[in-house]
Amino acid sequence: MKYDLIVIGAGSGGVRAARIASVHGAKVAIVENNRFGGTCVNVGCVPKKLYYYLSQLNKDIENYKSYGWSIPKPSLNWKLFIKKKDQEISRLNKIYEGILSRNKIDIINGTAQFLNSQKIKVGKKTYQAKKFIISTGGKPRIPNISKNTKLINTSDDIFTLKKLPKRMVIEGGGYIAIEFAFIFANLGVKVDLVYRGKQILKSFDSEIVDFLIQSTPKGKIKYHLESQIEKVDKSKNDLIINLTNKKKISSDYILSAIGRVANTENLGLENTNVQLNENKSIKVNRHFQTNDSNIYAVGDVIDYVNLTPVAIRQGHFLADKLFNNKKTIEYDFANIPTAVFTSPQIGTVGLTLEMAKKNKIDAYELTTNFKSMKKTFSKTNKDTFYKLVIDKKDKTILGIHIISDDAAELIQILAVNVV
């Protein structure tokens, strides 16, 4: 079979690229070896947010008493929740498949391998195309093998958790690890967070991070900074986690969330001119073209900004550029709003003061913090902190960093003010 475009990977970026290319009249096929929707739908934002909403409901119950409500102790049917979560993901899988079918995009089930720059093999069949887009996404980074990885779960595994543990050790200091730490802590799990660095969320504003740590209710999350999991042993009833700082932790479940890596293995890229970066992500130019003129890449596989809206925008831009006769609008990924689903949430867009200084911009900060009226009846700490980074020269806003309830929604609106 010959196509104008073959997309490898039916995640958010790949599906958008395929759909837009088809709208422009291209003959398109898409290859997928798993479920439609990619990381976001199956093992990312969607199930993560469902976990988060579940945990927030439990957290809210604690605050109802402050308003005079008398509520019997609730019980969680974890198996029912997981069943409903899986049903929701299946619904979204079908929506993605429907988008492809309605746009007359051929679906090829299996794993693609390049034979050369114009041809791939899927199973026993070969397919040709004038252009290829690789959108195979990423996968969890696997911890060091000496840590007895059979006892360690990844951020993909967490979504098939059969029962809620009483104790959990999470290794990692990025947003994935921190989100899960707060999710499970708010579900009543005793969480120990292990991170090799001095500060969690190191790419975020340090004052925001400090505020988050101070907002953590006592006893819910214990932080073990400047340490790593060195070894894991199993006793009759416990997992024994040995840390590099010589401390030992007993737990029921271990989650490794030490980052994600690009999915570039077994694609047959050695049969093309595609080059990889040191971290195995695909090297592209600003128009997402690889070193092979026929092959492009978008989304997490290029390890630029690993967010679903970014992958969608990249796929849309690229399909317009390749198959639309009209001049495409240049993209700008300078100020991308980002959220972290903690308690309270973090929202950020633009530069921190440290970033501004590195860019040799003379800037200053405006900050405020307070407790919202909703929380004044409860015994929670201050739950809201806002920070603006201002250009001293022209008073424009360079960055906005907030921590509060609904910060993930607020930052979308506030982002339009950042230049």
State where each predicted segment sits.
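Gly/Ala-rich phosphate-binding loop of Rossmann-like dinucleotide-binding domains
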Residues: 18, 22, 181-186
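Glycine-rich flavin
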Residues: 2-3, 19-26, 31-164, 197-201, ...
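Beta1/beta-strand and adjacent pyrophosphate-binding region of the FAD-binding site
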Residues: 1-11, 164-174
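Short hydrophobic core segments
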Residues: 6-8, 112, 127-137, 170-171, ...
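FAD-site-proximal beta/loop scaffold in flavoenzymes
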Residues: 149-165, 248-325
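Flexible, glycine-rich terminal cap/loop adjacent to redox cofactors
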Residues: 6-13, 17-34, 39, 46, ...
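Catalytic nucleophile loop
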Residues: 14, 174-177, 311
